[in-house]
């Protein structure tokens, strides 16, 4: 079959001085960073949905891309053509992983039977492509938000039959992910929220989605899936309010239903923006709570109130993100999936490469800067010094529960405590970070 990207052999590392737009300047897969290959640190993935499924349509205009596999035709044959192009792209981009929703790779069909038959055929196609290319599945998921049946949600739907249909999709997608060797399974509640409280029973819906997640965990263990289950937080869009608002909200939900040891989070940068947080905040919070799993690397626009899903280009932002990840020991089953799309005006098929190459270079340079920060250890030393009192006798007695509130008040009076505020040195630390970012 003729190559779709016929003007490109493969994207390769050419170094920081290169002006070739189809080459990496900073991402060198085999370069050692803190004793580990860069590819193994970053675990890059390209997503099926934005890259191969979106046709360029938006709220105000029809599709603009004219991809060959998006033309009228027999649905399964078009899905196979899309898979051909997808794996050509993945190979030429030199990414080790990809991610998909069920209906990204397979026609949904008109019934559950058609859905399952179509998906089964496409799983066989994908398995053959993976074997041929060496590309692996980072994670799979089920799209339980696009079809009109999910207008009022999937697991939170007022109709238990819709809940059951969603369960069928999730079981099928989990089984497919397992068969394809996927390292994670993601649950994003696209419409698990509400438009108005006037017709919403919050307690009922919370109980429903809690039970749904418990069943997902039960099925994971029953099928022997060794990967990680991930919830992807998002505060709103398409609903007014979504129940997986941010990392902290998800943790509270997991604790309520006894799932905090079973499910981690897949954090998207743009979703952090929509929640009023920095990407750094969400990563650090997940690590602090012990539920960090994987990352959807992209960026939003702070001046817009919706998910723009642009490619990450800020080394300043992502160096701090990679710093947190490195300090926590790096990815295990997770990775950096580019949940990002070219702009509607970017109609050249090679724009797909330009977007991903820039993003991969951004994250690679961020990794190298973060590694310098870890090796230098200056930030850690200053934070440790700031909290040093908690390693002393008084601090340890408080943390170990050896003093009651009343005893602590008595201690303060007996010792005539008169603590004086110590500077947080924020400006000094910001200058220190800039040294790592901009000094050669």
UniProtKB/Swiss-Prot annotation:
Cofactors required: Mg(2+)
Subcellular location: Cytoplasm
Enzyme class of the recorded protein, top EC level: isomerase
Catalyzed chemical reaction(s): alpha-D-xylose = alpha-D-xylulofuranose
UniProt GO molecular function: magnesium ion binding; xylose isomerase activity
Binding-site residues for Mg(2+) 1, renumbered to this chain: 232, 268, 296, 339
Gene Ontology CC: one annotated term: cytoplasm
EC number: 5.3.1.5
Protein name, entry field: Xylose isomerase
InterPro entries assigned to the protein according to its UniProt record, in alphabetical order: Xyl_isomerase-like_sf, Xylose_isom_bac, Xylose_isomerase
Cofactor note: Binds 2 magnesium ions per subunit.
Quaternary assembly: Homotetramer.
Positions of Mg(2+) 2 binding: 268, 271, 307, 309
Gene (name only): xylA
HAMAP family named among the record's database cross-references: Xylose_isom_A
Top-level division of the source organism's lineage: Bacteria
Active-site residues (renumbered): 101, 104
GO terms classed as biological process: D-xylose metabolic process
